[in-house]
């Protein structure tokens, strides 16, 4: 677990302080006086992680409690919340260990710390890969519901959804283990960045197609003035809007980190890139922020889930 600022935290395999990783610590005269470095306190990381942990636990409990939410769409949303939960647990665990080690309250071997760091790295990487996969799965689910509405329930069945979920988790954990084991290979970074861009491209294409179809239907419905169809189409538009918001926030929160990985390969010692590298902790804080925002979007966009969340909160009191 790297212990030096500014890049001492998560995803140690991509951290400049790890042995064998690209040397990214540039001095002030290499980056220039114009270089902006945003420092993120440990307390902020711990607070963000705890907030995200509580929110995503509530989402998982709400979906598990309400039988009306036991559908493929909400199963994928639940797994997305579990991915965010992995981020939260990892953040809280690592920040706590850092504080304990820095305070000298825990004396342990370097090899033990390294093993703990590897476990945290696998958790974070698995959550990253699984988040992308489940966002893609949600987009595909919505696409089928709009363009193959009559066949939707025969195409997207619960058994198929469960098998897809199992496959995604197995693939995410397996690939993350390999990524951490071979962290000092440039191919690892390129694979992660390529997977991120490919998944985003797929989702953008699906969303653009869905929004185009929704716009055509809205125009036709406006001419017919049939309220029943309008309500049904409004439901679909609401779902597409929710997923678009999720995708946009995911891109804004994860984009800087993937740009960071890309620049490690392209310009590891360039002054401008070095300035960007100094803000790794900021990019990681954005990732945690993404895991906080996701449950809020579910609660405000889904009336059924919002009502269940209220019931869960009232029961907890």
UniProtKB/Swiss-Prot annotation:
Membrane topology according to the record: Multi-pass membrane protein
Compartments where found: Cell membrane
Major localization listed first in the record, in broad terms: membrane
Source superkingdom: Eukaryota
Residues linked to a glycan: 15, 29
Cytoplasmic side: 64-72, 141-163, 212-240, 301-317
Residue intervals passing through the bilayer: 38-63, 73-93, 119-140, 164-183, 192-211, 241-266, 280-300
InterPro entries, per the entry: GPCR_Rhodpsn (IPR000276), GPCR_Rhodpsn_7TM (IPR017452), Melcrt_ACTH_rcpt (IPR001671), MSH_rcpt (IPR000761)
Residue numbers with lipid attached (S-palmitoyl cysteine): 315
Membrane topology (Extracellular): 1-37, 94-118, 184-191, 267-279
Its job: Receptor for MSH (alpha, beta and gamma) and ACTH. The activity of this receptor is mediated by G proteins which activate adenylate cyclase. Mediates melanogenesis, the production of eumelanin (black/brown) and phaeomelanin (red/yellow), via regulation of cAMP signaling in melanocytes.
Protein name, per record: Melanocyte-stimulating hormone receptor
Species: Chaetodipus penicillatus (Desert pocket mouse)
Higher taxonomy: Eukaryota, Metazoa, Chordata, Craniata, Vertebrata
């Amino acid at each position: 677990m790297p212990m030096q600022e500014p890049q001492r935290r998560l995803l140690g395999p991509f951290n400049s302080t790890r042995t064998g990783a690209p040397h990214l610590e540039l001095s002030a005269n290499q980056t220039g006086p114009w270089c902006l470095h945003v420092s993120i306190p440990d307390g902020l990381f711990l607070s963000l992680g705890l907030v995200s942990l509580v929110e995503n636990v509530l989402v998982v409990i709400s979906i598990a409690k309400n039988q009306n939410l036991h559908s493929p769409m909400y199963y994928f949303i639940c797994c997305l919340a579990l991915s965010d939960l992995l981020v939260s647990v990892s953040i809280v665990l690592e920040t706590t260990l850092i504080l304990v080690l820095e305070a000298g309250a825990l004396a342990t071997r370097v090899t033990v710390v390294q093993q703990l760091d590897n476990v945290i790295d696998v958790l974070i990487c698995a959550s990253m890969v699984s988040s992308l996969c489940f966002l893609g799965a949600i987009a595909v689910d919505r696409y089928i519901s709009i363009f193959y509405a009559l066949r939707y329930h025969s195409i997207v069945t619960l058994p198929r959804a469960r098998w897809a979920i199992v496959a995604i988790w197995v693939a995410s954990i397996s690939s993350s283990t390999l990524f951490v084991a071979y962290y000092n290979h440039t191919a690892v970074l390129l694979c992660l960045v390529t997977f991120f861009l490919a998944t985003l491209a797929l989702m953008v294409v699906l969303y653009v197609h869905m929004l185009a179809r929704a716009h055509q239907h809205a125009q036709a419905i406006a001419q017919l003035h049939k309220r029943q169809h309008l309500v049904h189409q409004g439901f679909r538009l609401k779902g597409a809007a929710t997923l678009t918001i999720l995708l946009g926030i995911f891109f804004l929160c994860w984009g800087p980190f993937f740009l960071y990985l890309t620049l490690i390969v392209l310009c590891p010692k360039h002054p401008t890139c070095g300035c960007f590298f100094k803000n790794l902790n900021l990019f990681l804080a954005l990732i945690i922020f993404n895991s906080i925002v996701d449950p809020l979007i579910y609660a405000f966009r889904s009336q059924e889930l919002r009502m269940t969340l209220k019931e869960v909160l009232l029961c907890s009191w």
